[in-house]
Amino acid sequence: MSIRERRLISWTPRRIRTTFLAYLALTKPRVIELLLVTTIPAMLLADRGTVDPLLILNTLVGGMLAAAGANTLNCVADADIDKVMKRTARRPLARATVPTRHALIFGLVLTVTSFCWLWLSTNLLSGLLAVATIAFYVFVYTMLLKRRTSQNVVWGGAAGCMPVMIGWSAVTGTIQWPALVMFLIIFFWTPPHTWALAMRYKDDYKAAGVPMLPAVATERQVTRQILIYTWLTVLTTLVLALATGWLYGAVALLAGAWFLVMAHQLYSGVKRGEPVKPLRLFLQSNNYLAVVFCALAIDSALALPTLL
């Protein structure tokens, strides 16, 4: 029996499934959920609910390919860190279930495909924004900022804000002020979201030598920063109300008050020296962003009268 025949026989249904799941894990599907939560509302706001469904579908497909490519290349660059941290030790490259070379090729193919898809199905600007996002996330955040500064997620988080820009540009072919405000909402939301999780896994970051803020600062300093960025997030969502109807404005105000209460509770608990549960803020921050952007989508789909 030849080597080729033995390799073909070794591809059992179980191995095929395991390999598929390993490559899927490289793309970090849960991270891609942010794309869905923010891109559709941005597109609906750009044209007040009259967007072609096919354009939305094409933008989502291209955006998901871009996010998958960025996440895969991130896994390649972070393979050494992932092996050390308990939270990431089961990732495919950390466990060597996918060869590094194959993961790199997979990530590059996804990147090129995302650019071509967005360029051909939407416009050149959206494709270029996707490639710029991937380059920024991999080279600026992952390879430069993440290992050198405690403010890594502040500036590196800009990559996670780009889906709204891509969605807006896919509809209009331009970038206008509401898109920039949505960018800032996610930009300010990212530090509280990420640092709350990092507080739970700060020992992991210390062991890996990653200067995430909770790993190098006191809990009081971290929660103070979380509080500041939470306020900035909520205030920015209210600025966006100028371009929306009353529904979004009301939901942004109520959800913002709820988000602020949770951030203040975390800060107050740390200040009093009480046991705190930062993971709760991390989980609820996801719900907060989803509620705000879902309200934006509904408001835009209904084409409610805007203030401006």
From Swiss-Prot:
Keywords assigned: Cell membrane, Heme biosynthesis, Membrane, Transferase, Transmembrane, Transmembrane helix
GO molecular function, one term: protoheme IX farnesyltransferase activity
GO biological process entries: heme O biosynthetic process
Domain of life: Bacteria
Membrane topology: Multi-pass membrane protein
The keyword Aminoacyl-tRNA synthetase is annotated on this UniProt entry: no
Pfam families assigned: UbiA
Catalytic activity: heme b + (2E,6E)-farnesyl diphosphate + H2O = Fe(II)-heme o + diphosphate
Keyword Membrane recorded: yes
GO cellular component: plasma membrane
Transmembrane segment boundaries: 31-51, 53-73, 102-122, 124-144, 149-169, 170-190, 242-262, 288-308
Further remark: Carbon 2 of the heme B porphyrin ring is defined according to the Fischer nomenclature.
Similarity field: Belongs to the UbiA prenyltransferase family. Protoheme IX farnesyltransferase subfamily.
Function of the protein: Converts heme B (protoheme IX) to heme O by substitution of the vinyl group on carbon 2 of heme B porphyrin ring with a hydroxyethyl farnesyl side group.
Protein's UniProt name: Protoheme IX farnesyltransferase
Native source organism of the sequence: Mycolicibacterium smegmatis (strain ATCC 700084 / mc(2)155)
Gene coding for it: ctaB
